[in-house]
Amino acid sequence: MDENKKRALAAALGQIEKQFGKGSVMRMGDRVVEPVEAIPTGSLMLDIALGIGGLPKGRVVEIYGPESSGKTTLTLQAIAECQKMGGTAAFIDAEHALDPIYAAKLGVNVDDLLLSQPDTGEQALEIADMLVRSGSVDILVIDSVAALTPKAEIEGEMGDQLPGLQARLMSQALRKLTGNIKRSNTLVIFINQLRMKIGVMMPGQSPETTTGGNALKFYASVRLDIRRIGAIKKGDEIIGNQTKIKVVKNKLAPPFKQVITEILYGEGISREGELIDMGVDAKLVEKAGAWYSYGEERIGQGKDNARGYLRDNPTVAAKLEAELREKFQPAEAAREEGDDEGEDE
């Protein structure tokens, strides 16, 4: 760059700093690039698939899927992990459906959890913004986007047609929230529901879409698609769900990773079950018939007994986890038409 241009740039930067404050514009090389802080999800498999060890702080995350697929369970486990690290958590329950007893079973300290059950979508998002701006909340969950009902809809008649109202509300809120989220380094998780698109579909295109318009798809740094794919049985009794979690969008690491984990009723994501499955995949745990072995030790006949052994022997589980963090590679998920929808990269 010639001298005249350098002087002009220095003058412009000086004027910008004077008007907008120091650090308004900076050279990338002047600042040390620090790794993104992450909050673990409670699922070792998912933490590895996300590439940064969990969900990123200072970013927006969207978790969506069909009903009873484990969306709220996953967010409550992330809250529990955040509280274990000494963080403060807030839960905006727009669905008015949070069960504190279930949350406590998942490890959430419900006495310290900040809870809001707002009347309107505007109130929910305003409370979220105020909590984020306080800079003292580490993780904030909004459950769910579909339940953020605009004030005009609540005050109107049952049959009133108000097209695009919720989408406009989300778009406006996210424009306002994003900068504050980054500055306060808060992880904000939006839980979302699925709806079916009405009308003619292109071949190969998914008929499913999320509620609240396209704004959240653009602003989210991570999008997770969570689905129940089977039942876990103990004899004839169903004790949980087999769940597939797909990283549909990831701005911080390669996306399209996929994991299959277990969510047990009343317990949440089975850490021990994950260690066994991952250990078998990574050839650290040997499976011969119904028996599972780790090193020289037989750890159980059948998965349920092996799970119990790891639960009773935390040092063995910790050793296996440390080895798996180095070796385990999550599966690549098949890309679908709808996966790129709303991505800006």
Curated annotation (Swiss-Prot):
Main localization category: cytoplasm
Residues given in the record as ATP binding sites: 65-72
Keyword annotations of the record: ATP-binding, Cytoplasm, DNA damage, DNA recombination, DNA repair, DNA-binding, Nucleotide-binding, SOS response
UniProt xrefs under InterPro entries: AAA+_ATPase, DNA_recomb/repair_RecA, DNA_recomb/repair_RecA_CS, P-loop_NTPase, RecA-like_C, RecA-like_N, RecA_ATP-bd, RecA_C_sf
GO biological process, one term: DNA repair
Pfam families listed in its UniProt record: RecA (PF00154), RecA_C (PF21096)
Keyword Nucleotide-binding set for record: yes
UniProt GO molecular function: ATP binding; ATP hydrolysis activity; ATP-dependent DNA damage sensor activity; damaged DNA binding; single-stranded DNA binding
Location of region: Disordered: 326-345
GO cellular component, as recorded: cytosol
Basic and acidic residues bias: start-end ranges: 326-336
Entry's localization field: Cytoplasm
NCBIfam families hit by this protein: tigrfam_recA (TIGR02012)
Summary of the function given for this chain in its UniProt record: Can catalyze the hydrolysis of ATP in the presence of single-stranded DNA, the ATP-dependent uptake of single-stranded DNA by duplex DNA, and the ATP-dependent hybridization of homologous single-stranded DNAs. It interacts with LexA causing its activation and leading to its autocatalytic cleavage.
Family: Belongs to the RecA family.
Protein name: Protein RecA
Species: Stenotrophomonas maltophilia (strain K279a)
Gene expressing this chain: recA
